[in-house]
């Protein structure tokens, strides 16, 4: 799965129905990240008015266990499930490592999106796990 500062190649794939299980949207441009996330959400799950197939977390207080549990839960009524972790760079080192360890086991029907406020460090265990997921 790509971790991208430039969302255009990702968006082109979404139009064709090509999705990855994990995305890392990083960089200081909050507007571009949010617009990219909203486009992914619209393409991936479409209309989910009750929010039954969407979960959100804040990296400042999220645990890897809770994120992975949500990301591992199959969607209601078939379909797809979207999980977002905003400010993912705020996860502690221990939580980051646990999250990285669990990425490979996510169901194909689900998509985990990590929103990173700064440029992501490519040496990070989590960034490397996202790239290989």
Question: Whereabouts are the PLM-identified features?
Answer:
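Conserved beta/loop motifs at nucleotide-recognition and modification sites
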Residues: 1-133
């Amino acid at each position: 799965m790509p971790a991208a500062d430039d969302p255009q190649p990702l968006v082109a794939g979404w139009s064709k129905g090509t999705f990855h299980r994990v995305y890392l949207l990083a960089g200081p441009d909050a507007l571009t990240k949010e617009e990219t996330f909203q486009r992914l959400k619209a393409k991936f799950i479409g209309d989910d008015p009750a929010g039954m197939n969407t979960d959100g977390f804040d990296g400042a207080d999220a645990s890897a266990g809770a994120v992975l549990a949500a990301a591992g839960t199959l969607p209601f009524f078939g379909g797809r499930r979207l999980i977002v972790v905003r400010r993912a760079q705020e996860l502690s080192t221990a939580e980051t490592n646990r999250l990285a360890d669990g990425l490979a086991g996510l169901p194909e029907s689900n998509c985990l999106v990590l929103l990173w406020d700064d440029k992501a460090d490519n040496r990070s265990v989590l960034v490397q796990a996202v790239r290989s997921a």
